Amino acid sequence: MLDLEAIRQLKYAYFRCLDTKDWEGVAACFVPEATATYPHHECESRVAIIDFLSTAMVPDLITMHHGHHPEIEIDNDRATGTWYLHDRVLAPAFEFALEGAGLYADRYVRTVDGWRMEHTGYARIFESTSTIDSGVKIEQGKRSRGE
């Protein structure tokens, strides 16, 4: 049970660090040789993952990532996990909004520093985009800009 909770906490930290643009925190979730598969982009190292995410998720982009209903299987020092993703993206400067769902498929490895991701990636179940009405007020918190 402790390993299950440690893996859940790792994924929760990944989502929190992603939305607060804490790139060092995101990097700490991965082993150096980690890989990632995002829609329309693949990464072959932890450095490549952080480069991609920090470039795609500019400070003015507001995001919310929630991971639900983890299905985690542990085999000694390795584990796999499937997570249900619900995400929202707001880009007020472009009057753009996205909401979607998907399934994450992760692989984890136990290291001397605890559990880390060796692969993450998701496939969409749906994605809905819309325009933000100019009368809608969106106030971005400092934490969402990485401050």
Predicted regions and their residues:
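Residues at structural and domain junctions
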Residues: 11-12, 35, 58, 94
